[in-house]
């Protein structure tokens, strides 16, 4: 008799032209991810082959009970690392039945920014460093920490190896490989300064694809931690006190920045970001004031400053960029729970479209 694992791993392509499409969307909190699956005829090679779908928005905090239908528009497809075969993950955004984006649909406005001719011409690249914390399920305390207690102070844990320094590497590696399988442009992982905290990087990816990939990478991480019985936290300061917070540093460049003379373009872009500091901070994640204190490799939330190789700055420029006169900059302000559609779109809008009055 087949066991559960055998059934889960059934290869449907041997007996059917049907595949499973897992539709994913951002829920009512603006940070939670929801998904449900449907059967479609495969293989699917382009998102235009997929039908729209709907869900009960009153159960996700996105619609009233008396008019609860929200429509899912498929926007990007990825290979499914859990079901494998020709099965797919589908990143969607959400609309009313009348075709209006609902308030939590931040992709719609980002897509407008990224389709603007001035933005398209500059081919914006993003590299997003997603930090996160793994928590023990029943006590909501970081993985590897004694329950109700604390490990030794920070110092030995960053990029470390060893049972007393690195906690959850099997989860991190499983996620890494699953993202590569899915077709996400994941460029690396590392252990972070606080024990139980890790980071993965997505990019360089162009425009809105970077944000789609971060959301799907988060979804895959939620699924991996679900299997492992561990809780994923994107809280920007999960443990108060002398512990690093969690951010989503966003590296950015345009065609002009990557060409000779690009360093001057970078400096002009940073000047614009300085003028809109408050607007960016307001959009860069909930609870970020607990993280951006001027300590633990952050700039104070109320102060904008930039520097070369300065990890205590709002914007950091790398030594190589300064030396070569071209390259990219890193916006260190976004929190780990930021919406990548909002952050990527806002950086492009401020640096490429915004005009000072």
Swiss-Prot record:
InterPro entries in the cross-refs: Gln_synt_N, Gln_synt_N_sf, Gln_synth/guanido_kin_cat_dom, Gln_synth_cat_dom, Gln_synth_gly_rich_site, Gln_synth_N_conserv_site, Glutamine_Synthetase
Gene Ontology molecular function: ATP binding; glutamine synthetase activity
Alphabetized UniProt keyword annotations: ATP-binding, Cytoplasm, Ligase, Nucleotide-binding
Record-annotated GS beta-grasp domain positions: 19-99
Intrachain disulfide bonds: none
Broad EC category: ligase
GO biological process: glutamine biosynthetic process
EC number: 6.3.1.2
Gene3D superfamilies reported for this sequence: Glutamine synthetase, N-terminal domain, Glutamine synthetase/guanido kinase, catalytic domain
A cellular component annotation (GO) from this entry: cytoplasm
Catalysis: reaction(s): L-glutamate + NH4(+) + ATP = L-glutamine + ADP + phosphate + H(+)
Function: High-affinity glutamine synthetase involved in ammonium assimilation. Plays an important role in the primary assimilation of ammonium taken up by roots. Plays a role in maintaining nitrogen metabolic balance during ammonium assimilation, thus controlling plant growth and development. Reassimilates ammonium generated during lignification within developing tillers, which is probably required for the outgrowth of axillary buds. Required for nitrogen-dependent biosynthesis of cytokinin. Active cytokinin in axillary bud meristem is required for axillary bud outgrowth and necessary for tillering.
Any further remark recorded for this protein: Plants overexpressing GLN1-2 exhibit a poor plant growth phenotype and yield, and decreased carbon/nitrogen ratio in the stem caused by the accumulation of nitrogen in the stem.
Domain GS catalytic, first and last residues per copy: 106-357
Induction comment from the UniProt entry of this chain: Induced in roots by ammonium supply.
Phenotype of the disrupted gene, per the record: Reduced number of tillers and panicles.
UniProt similarity note: Belongs to the glutamine synthetase family.
Organism of derivation: Oryza sativa subsp. japonica (Rice)
Protein name, entry field: Glutamine synthetase cytosolic isozyme 1-2
Complexes and interactors: Homooctamer.
Tissue specificity field: Expressed in roots and at lower levels in leaf blades and spikelets (rice flower).
Location of the protein in the cell: Cytoplasm
Domain of life: Eukaryota
């Amino acid at each position: 008799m087949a066991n559960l694992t055998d059934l889960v791993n059934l290869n449907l392509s041997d007996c059917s032209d049907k595949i499973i499409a897992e539709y994913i969307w951002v829920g009512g909190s603006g940070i939670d991810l929801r998904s449900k699956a449907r059967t479609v005829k495969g293989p699917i090679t382009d998102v235009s082959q997929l039908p729209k779908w709907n869900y009960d928005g009153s159960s996700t905090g996105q619609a009233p009970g008396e008019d609860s239908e929200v429509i899912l528009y498929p926007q990007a497809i990825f290979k499914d690392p859990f079901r494998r075969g020709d099965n797919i993950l589908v990143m969607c955004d959400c609309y009313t039945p009348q075709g209006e984006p609902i308030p939590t649909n931040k992709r719609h406005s980002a897509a407008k920014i990224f389709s603007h001719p001035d933005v398209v011409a500059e081919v914006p690249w993003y590299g997003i460093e997603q930090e996160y914390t793994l928590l023990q399920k029943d006590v909501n305390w970081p993985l590897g920490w004694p329950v109700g207690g604390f490990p030794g102070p920070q110092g030995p844990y960053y990029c470390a190896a060893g049972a007393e320094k690195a906690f959850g590497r099997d989860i991190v590696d499983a996620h890494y490989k699953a993202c590569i399988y899915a077709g996400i442009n994941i460029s690396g992982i590392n252990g972070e300064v606080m024990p139980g905290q890790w980071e993965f990087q997505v990019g360089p990816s162009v425009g809105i694809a970077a944000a789609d990939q971060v959301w799907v990478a988060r979804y895959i991480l939620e699924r991996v931690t679900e299997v492992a019985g561990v809780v994923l936290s994107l809280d920007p300061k999960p443990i108060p006190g002398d512990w690093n917070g969690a951010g989503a540093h966003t590296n950015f460049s345009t065609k002009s920045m990557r060409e000779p003379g690009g360093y001057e373009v970078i400096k002009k872009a940073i000047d614009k970001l300085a003028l809109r500091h408050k607007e960016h901070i307001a959009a860069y994640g909930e609870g970020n004031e607990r993280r951006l204190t001027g300590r633990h490799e952050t700039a104070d939330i109320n102060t904008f400053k930039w520097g070369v190789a300065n990890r205590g700055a709002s914007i950091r420029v790398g030594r190589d960029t300064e030396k070569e006169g071209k390259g990219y900059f890193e916006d260190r302000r976004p929190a780990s729970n930021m919406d990548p559609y909002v952050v990527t779109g806002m950086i492009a809008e401020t640096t490429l479209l915004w005009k000072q009055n």
